[in-house]
Amino acid sequence: MKKEFLWGVSQSGFQFEMGDRFNRNLDTRSDWWHWVRDPVNLKKELVSGDLPEEGINNYELYPLDHSLAKELGLNAYSLNLEWSRIFPCPTYGVEVDYELDGNGLIKRVKITKETLRELDEIANKNEVYHYTHVLTNLKKLGFKVALTLTHYTHPLWLHDPIESRDTNLQNERNGWVSQRSVLEFAKFAAYLAYKFGHLVDIWATFNEPMVMVELGYLAPYSGFPPGVVNPQRAKEAIINIINAHARAYDAIREFEKEAPIGIIANNVGTSYPKDPNDPEDIKAAQMTDFFHSGLLLQALTRGDLNIEFDMETTIKVPHLKRLDWIGITYYSREVVTHSEPKFPEIPITGFRGVPGYGYSCPPNELSKDGYPVSDLGWEVYPEGIYNSIKAASEYGKPVYVMENGIADSKDLLRPYFIASHVAYIERALESGFDVRGYFHWALTDNYEWAMGFRMRFGLYSVDMITKERLPRKESLEVYREIVENGGLTERIKREYLGVRGREDDSR
């Protein structure tokens, strides 16, 4: 791989930051903070009962985590800054001029120096100071910094998940259902570029925004806020998220002229038909991919907005065409079959997942195709990352693998997982695809959203009492060797590839 290729790890604020001994660094103003402790959610067992304040304390221990990443030989680090920490109180009062297009979308948001001054007055200076130190430390250690604006979480003043659930999104603080969120996101983006632009090498607006919509608005038992079924509101949220990305892009570009700006999408080109000879199943796989990521990426790379959610009816919206790179996350595939649309309002939901493959497997067994399965019940299917890169590349932008990892507390599968996925990334590069980086999820164990601390994704395990980082030695050795050599070595190929899984004969 090229010398400029980025080798890194990824993390998010809410999942990693909290957990100091005296609870001095809590973020109590986010939607997820309130969601995971809600009595209704706990009673229904939609959330684990684990709380983020019991976490790994990256807020204080970030110098240690950065040094561990440096010892691995990594040259890049991906993270987000928590919106609710920087702006725990609303930014609505900071007024901005904006312009609508003929379709009612926000075409332009005017961010001025006065806007930034007003935002700076209400920002939490302690958190700005803290994040400045975090990013500065990364730069001092020689990392390329990939900064995401938001990773699932939102300030409570923007999205109250309990109100949203109880009113079926008819409340004011209903997140991306409200177009005003587009304006607030543009302000947030501008402020981060203004304050931290000199410390950031690569920008992303959203991490997996469709996950928020699919699980929060269409899958009430997923454990994601606000836990409702409201297809019409889901459509509105998707349009607003697309619009918000474009306006955040413009806001960043106003103050940061060179750093590339992208978005991190999930399940790009990872759907497979149950019967590859059945036209209906083939169509179902195409719809699945389009729903997860194609609708989003088509709008942001071509300015084609599929307003009817049917893969056909598009309108040209040139001011949405704002994207420099595409980030993909890849954990497993999906195998789907044709069905009637789950939601008639969203025609592209005419698919159904097939149990025994992808994300729908019994934990720690074998999938129906004989592949190993993680602690989380996700099939290890490394071939899929090649197809994901190929699908993302069709949009004509450079590709970064921004998340790839496995829940594997005993570290039985992770060494093979890393080696096999890197092998398919190398194959993608050999095929001519412009892949520029690989970020492993994650450096350490962390808080896996509604599932709490049960799923262990880290190259380092974490003692949740002492917060000690304990190396998962074999995975660390494999990843370190790959990074040091710029790709797979003959030893790794010989010892790990061609072997799908190994028995636990020593632990």
Task: Label the model's feature ranges.
Residues 1-46, 89-91, 100-119, 124-507:
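Active-site region of glycoside hydrolase catalytic domains
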Residues 44-54:
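Acidic/histidine-rich helix-loop elements
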Residues 52, 86-91:
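Surface-exposed loop and membrane-interface regions of Gram-negative outer-membrane beta-barrel proteins
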Residues 57-58, 89:
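Chitinase-like catalytic core of GlcNAc-active glycosidases
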Residues 60-82, 321-325, 391:
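Catalytic domains of carbohydrate-active enzymes, especially glycoside hydrolases
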